Amino acid sequence: TVIDHLFRSLQANRFLEALEETVDVARATGQRAEAYHLKAAGEKNWPKMAQAIAMVDAARAEGLDVSANMYAYTAGATGLTAALPPWVQAGGHDAMVARLKDPAIRARVLAEMRDPDVAWENLRLLAGSDERLILIEFHDPALKPLTGRTLAEVARERGTSGEETVLDLIVEDDSRVGA
Protein backbone atom coordinates (compact mmCIF):
# COMPACT_ATOMS: atom_id res chain seq x y z
CA THR A 1 0.00 0.00 0.00
CA VAL A 2 1.24 3.45 -0.92
CA ILE A 3 0.11 6.20 1.42
CA ASP A 4 0.64 9.78 0.36
CA HIS A 5 0.11 12.40 3.04
CA LEU A 6 -0.62 15.63 1.23
CA PHE A 7 1.37 17.97 3.42
CA ARG A 8 0.98 21.74 3.64
CA SER A 9 2.74 22.64 0.40
CA LEU A 10 0.50 20.26 -1.56
CA GLN A 11 -2.89 21.04 -0.01
CA ALA A 12 -3.66 24.18 -1.95
CA ASN A 13 -2.69 25.45 -5.37
CA ARG A 14 -0.85 22.24 -6.31
CA PHE A 15 -3.04 19.61 -4.69
CA LEU A 16 -4.34 18.27 -8.03
CA GLU A 17 -0.77 17.65 -9.18
CA ALA A 18 -0.03 15.86 -5.90
CA LEU A 19 -3.10 13.67 -6.30
CA GLU A 20 -2.16 12.92 -9.91
CA GLU A 21 1.26 11.77 -8.69
CA THR A 22 -0.40 9.44 -6.17
CA VAL A 23 -2.52 7.92 -8.96
CA ASP A 24 0.57 7.59 -11.16
CA VAL A 25 2.40 5.69 -8.40
CA ALA A 26 -0.55 3.28 -8.09
CA ARG A 27 -0.57 2.82 -11.86
CA ALA A 28 3.20 2.21 -12.06
CA THR A 29 3.44 -0.14 -9.08
CA GLY A 30 0.10 -1.91 -9.13
CA GLN A 31 -0.16 -1.17 -5.42
CA ARG A 32 -3.12 0.26 -3.55
CA ALA A 33 -2.72 4.02 -3.01
CA GLU A 34 -4.43 6.41 -0.63
CA ALA A 35 -4.16 10.18 -0.54
CA TYR A 36 -4.37 11.29 3.09
CA HIS A 37 -5.80 14.69 3.95
CA LEU A 38 -7.06 15.53 0.50
CA LYS A 39 -8.17 19.13 0.74
CA ALA A 40 -8.40 22.22 -1.38
CA ALA A 41 -6.98 24.89 0.91
CA GLY A 42 -7.90 28.41 -0.07
CA GLU A 43 -11.24 29.59 -1.35
CA LYS A 44 -9.94 29.93 -4.91
CA ASN A 45 -9.14 26.20 -4.85
CA TRP A 46 -12.49 24.96 -3.55
CA PRO A 47 -13.94 24.40 -7.03
CA LYS A 48 -11.04 22.04 -7.79
CA MET A 49 -12.35 19.45 -5.32
CA ALA A 50 -14.86 18.15 -7.88
CA GLN A 51 -11.96 17.55 -10.27
CA ALA A 52 -10.02 15.73 -7.52
CA ILE A 53 -12.94 13.41 -6.81
CA ALA A 54 -13.31 12.80 -10.55
CA MET A 55 -9.60 11.86 -10.71
CA VAL A 56 -10.07 9.26 -7.97
CA ASP A 57 -13.23 7.94 -9.64
CA ALA A 58 -11.46 7.70 -13.02
CA ALA A 59 -8.53 5.82 -11.46
CA ARG A 60 -10.93 3.38 -9.83
CA ALA A 61 -12.81 2.94 -13.13
CA GLU A 62 -9.43 2.12 -14.70
CA GLY A 63 -9.11 -0.72 -12.19
CA LEU A 64 -6.67 0.98 -9.83
CA ASP A 65 -7.18 0.62 -6.08
CA VAL A 66 -7.02 4.33 -5.28
CA SER A 67 -8.82 6.15 -2.49
CA ALA A 68 -8.59 9.37 -0.51
CA ASN A 69 -9.71 10.69 2.83
CA MET A 70 -10.68 14.27 3.48
CA TYR A 71 -10.80 16.60 6.42
CA ALA A 72 -14.28 16.65 7.88
CA TYR A 73 -14.12 20.32 8.84
CA THR A 74 -13.98 23.68 7.12
CA ALA A 75 -11.16 25.24 9.10
CA GLY A 76 -7.59 24.34 9.90
CA ALA A 77 -4.88 25.32 12.33
CA THR A 78 -1.26 26.13 11.69
CA GLY A 79 1.14 28.90 12.58
CA LEU A 80 1.56 32.38 11.16
CA THR A 81 4.83 31.07 9.76
CA ALA A 82 2.68 29.38 7.09
CA ALA A 83 2.35 32.88 5.61
CA LEU A 84 6.12 33.23 5.16
CA PRO A 85 8.29 32.25 2.20
CA PRO A 86 10.10 28.96 2.82
CA TRP A 87 13.55 30.48 2.29
CA VAL A 88 13.17 32.82 5.28
CA GLN A 89 12.44 29.80 7.50
CA ALA A 90 15.55 27.87 6.42
CA GLY A 91 17.92 26.99 9.25
CA GLY A 92 15.25 26.91 11.95
CA HIS A 93 13.34 29.30 14.14
CA ASP A 94 16.23 31.37 15.51
CA ALA A 95 17.66 31.95 12.04
CA MET A 96 14.22 32.96 10.78
CA VAL A 97 13.66 35.47 13.59
CA ALA A 98 17.11 36.97 13.00
CA ARG A 99 16.24 37.41 9.31
CA LEU A 100 12.89 39.00 10.14
CA LYS A 101 14.71 41.61 12.24
CA ASP A 102 16.90 42.63 9.29
CA PRO A 103 15.20 45.58 7.50
CA ALA A 104 16.34 44.57 4.00
CA ILE A 105 15.24 40.96 4.42
CA ARG A 106 12.00 42.06 6.07
CA ALA A 107 11.19 44.25 3.04
CA ARG A 108 11.78 41.30 0.70
CA VAL A 109 9.60 39.04 2.85
CA LEU A 110 6.79 41.62 2.92
CA ALA A 111 6.93 41.97 -0.87
CA GLU A 112 6.70 38.20 -1.34
CA MET A 113 3.87 37.89 1.19
CA ARG A 114 1.85 40.41 -0.83
CA ASP A 115 2.48 38.73 -4.18
CA PRO A 116 -0.32 36.30 -5.09
CA ASP A 117 1.82 34.79 -7.85
CA VAL A 118 4.79 33.54 -5.80
CA ALA A 119 5.73 29.87 -6.26
CA TRP A 120 5.13 28.94 -2.60
CA GLU A 121 1.68 28.59 -1.06
CA ASN A 122 0.92 31.47 1.29
CA LEU A 123 -1.79 30.19 3.60
CA ARG A 124 -2.60 33.74 4.70
CA LEU A 125 -3.55 34.71 1.15
CA LEU A 126 -5.34 31.40 0.69
CA ALA A 127 -7.55 32.21 3.68
CA GLY A 128 -8.94 35.09 1.64
CA SER A 129 -8.97 37.67 4.42
CA ASP A 130 -7.21 38.53 7.66
CA GLU A 131 -10.70 38.47 9.21
CA ARG A 132 -10.60 34.69 8.74
CA LEU A 133 -7.32 34.22 10.64
CA ILE A 134 -7.89 33.75 14.35
CA LEU A 135 -4.86 33.96 16.62
CA ILE A 136 -4.96 30.95 18.94
CA GLU A 137 -1.58 30.43 20.59
CA PHE A 138 1.03 32.73 22.09
CA HIS A 139 3.94 31.93 24.39
CA ASP A 140 4.59 35.48 25.65
CA PRO A 141 2.19 36.32 28.52
CA ALA A 142 2.01 39.92 27.27
CA LEU A 143 0.54 38.70 23.96
CA LYS A 144 -1.90 36.14 25.38
CA PRO A 145 -4.74 38.73 25.51
CA LEU A 146 -4.68 38.63 21.69
CA THR A 147 -5.80 34.98 21.77
CA GLY A 148 -9.12 34.57 19.98
CA ARG A 149 -8.79 37.84 18.08
CA THR A 150 -8.48 38.02 14.31
CA LEU A 151 -5.31 39.10 12.59
CA ALA A 152 -7.32 41.95 11.03
CA GLU A 153 -8.38 43.27 14.46
CA VAL A 154 -4.84 43.21 15.81
CA ALA A 155 -3.45 44.84 12.66
CA ARG A 156 -6.02 47.65 12.86
CA GLU A 157 -5.25 48.28 16.54
CA ARG A 158 -1.52 48.39 15.84
CA GLY A 159 -1.91 50.52 12.72
CA THR A 160 0.10 48.05 10.64
CA SER A 161 -0.71 45.91 7.62
CA GLY A 162 -1.67 42.27 8.05
CA GLU A 163 1.70 41.22 6.65
CA GLU A 164 3.64 43.48 9.03
CA THR A 165 1.54 42.26 11.94
CA VAL A 166 2.38 38.64 11.07
CA LEU A 167 6.10 39.41 11.13
CA ASP A 168 5.86 41.51 14.29
CA LEU A 169 3.92 38.86 16.21
CA ILE A 170 6.32 36.07 15.21
CA VAL A 171 9.30 38.15 16.37
CA GLU A 172 7.61 39.47 19.55
CA ASP A 173 6.34 36.05 20.62
CA ASP A 174 9.51 34.28 19.48
CA SER A 175 7.27 31.49 18.16
CA ARG A 176 5.34 30.45 15.09
CA VAL A 177 2.16 31.94 16.68
CA GLY A 178 -0.73 29.53 16.38
CA ALA A 179 -3.50 30.58 14.01
Regions of interest found by a model, annotated:
Residues 7-32, 36-179:
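Active-site neighborhoods of metal-dependent hydrolases
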Residues 1-6:
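Extended, charged catalytic domains and RNA/DNA-binding interfaces, predominantly
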